[in-house]
Amino acid sequence: MSRLVGIIGAGRLGQAMARTALRAGRHVVISNSRGPGSLASVVSELGAGASAATASQAAAAGIVVIAVPWDRVPEAIEGFEWDGQIVIDATNDFDAGDLRGRTSSELLADLVAGARVVKTANTLTAAVLASDPHEAGGQRVIFLSGDDDQAKSDVSKLFNDAGFFVIDLGDLITGGQMQQIHGPLAGVNLVRLPMGN
């Protein structure tokens, strides 16, 4: 399992995912379209374990988070080589464009052919994702889906280590339909409370 998490996109979602990975004890390389030099303040705020990188360097990590607006995804990942990396699809297609009956995660999987896509972190707001997942004595719930069991296991461990309670929704199509922006789990913020004795 990779200890390095690459993040493509340094906005609110990218920074929230960086905080989550750091909380889980991972190292983070974060990138944006303007280059590493523009990320000094972001990296300083994230603290130890975080560094700035180019998008291609972030894409070479064992786990890669796509955290850019959906309409910018093709440009953000164009030309990268995908060879077994785990790609976390944290995007949402807010414009609900014509996906021809497919989920946005299926389309992303086509763009990163050779990678193993796991859909997660898109049903919570960036602010909630970045906050302490232990609430009211329980654990914040995060959903994921994907077609590769080992990839889902590695991503589950990342979120478990960060303090979340992970629920696996199954394959990318089934889970993706529930997680996408007009699906039943979009915007749902649940906390798993401990069972009483």
PLM-predicted stretches and their roles:
Residues 16, 20, 111, 158:
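Rossmann-fold NAD(P)-dependent oxidoreductase module
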Residues 128, 141-197:
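Active-site-lining helix/loop region of Rossmann-like oxidoreductase modules
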Residues 1-45:
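NAD(P)+-binding Rossmann beta1-loop-alpha1 motif at the extreme N-terminus of oxidoreductases
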Residues 47-49, 54-86, 90-96:
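Rossmann-like NAD(P)-binding element
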Residues 91-134:
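Rossmann-fold NAD(P)-binding glycine/threonine-rich loop
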Residues 79-84, 111-112, 135-136:
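Short, conserved loop/helix-junction motifs that constitute active-site signature segments
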Residues 52, 116-122, 167-169:
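General beta-strand structural signal in soluble alpha/beta enzymes
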